[in-house]
Structure formats: C-alpha cells, structure tokens
Design a protein with these regions (language model features):
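Linear-motif-rich, low-complexity cytosolic tails and juxtamembrane regions
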Residues: 1-48, 52-100
Length: 100
C-alpha cells in the first residue's frame, strides 16, 4: 500500500543517502530549505518516489502498480484513466495527486 510520498537524496553534509517522507514531493524540498540545505551544494536529488506501509521506498512506476493493486486511486484519477486509452502493461508514474 502506498502511504506517503518521499524523496531520496544524497546528503553531502552527512555523506549518506537519506529518504525524506512527505505529503507531496515539493514538501521535501521545503523541509530541506528550512534546514538550510541548498540543492547541488548540500544535497543531490536521487529519485522521487513513495513509501509503503513498511517504509520501503518505491519508484514512481512501482508505486503506480502498488496503488493500482491496492485500489488506491482517487475517483477523479480513475475517471481520467477511463477517458484515455492506455495499455495495461504500459509503465506509468504515480503522482501524489493520483492517490490523495
């Protein structure tokens, strides 16, 4: 189950990868800014994705399939999918607006 958005970064200050959980991906960058981090100088963005109920990081594509399998899409997003043609095996990316 998709539980929250997350951004994986490489923290140059601490010399390690970190995952920042958030409601929307842009919130992670606001959090970093609040702590005085500057993109490129203090951290490098690795990937935007989501966390599951076990705090495992998923790519946007893996999270889309997880949300689909767990029936988590908003009704508006389900309606949008019904209006467009897409092949069920075509990889899609999940955006937080699709699930909450």
């Amino acid at each position: 189950m998709v539980c929250r958005a997350a951004v994986k970064i490489y923290d140059k200050r601490q010399d390690k990868e970190m995952i920042i959980p958030c409601h929307r991906h842009c919130d992670a960058f606001l959090i970093l800014k609040e702590f005085g981090y500057k993109k490129g100088e203090d951290f490098k963005e690795i990937e935007q994705g989501f966390l599951d109920e076990h705090d495992r990081f998923m790519s946007r594509i893996a999270a889309w399939w997880e949300a689909k399998n767990c029936n988590q899409f908003t009704q508006a997003y389900k309606n949008e999918l019904a209006q467009e043609y897409y092949h069920p095996a075509t990889p899609r990316q999940l955006f937080s607006e699709d699930v909450w």
